[in-house]
Amino acid sequence: SAFASPADDKQAEANAALEKLNAYQAELDEASGNYQNALQEQLDAEAKVDEAQKQIEEKTTEIQGYQEQLGDRARDMYRSGSTTFLDVILGATSFEDFATTWNILEDMNQDDAQLVQQTKTAREELEAAKTEAEEQAKVASDKAEEAKQVADAADAKAAEMQAVYDGLSAEAAELVQQEQAAEEAAQATAAEEAIASG
């Protein structure tokens, strides 16, 4: 017929709702993808923090080792009656020999002190890197939280439109059935009238 039936109108509404639903679903897919990416960034940043912490602990252990080494040697050198100290004095055949041995010991101590300093500097750099990684992790965490809210909102919109579409589809199907039943009834009535008038 030239006029759209109520079922056609309802089906057109359902089709429009389906288009919106598909658009919302695409939004949801994108938002979910963004959330997954943000979450991965957060995990990566947190892994960097853990790695930096591990390296800091290793450097701290190194520093302690060097400091103990320095302390032991200093005690050996300066403690009265120390074997090393006596060896330096008694083992020296001349003053030049004594001075050379003493200088070697001092150089060793300076080398150790330098090692301690270098290791401390390395630890400070690691601590700075850890702080930076923690800041990145915080930013990534905020981004992930924001992305999750967007995804949740998109999910709610899609679910709402799904319900609208399902409702309209059901109504359209019901109207089609009613129209078919009415048409069948009209045909039956027309047939009865034809028989009666025949």
What is each PLM-predicted segment?
Residues 82-86:
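Envelope-exposed proteins and targeting segments
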Residues 94:
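Active-site helix-to-loop segments that bind/position phosphate- or nucleotide-bearing substrates
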Residues 2-76, 102-198:
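Alpha-helical oligomerization segments with coiled-coil/rod-like character
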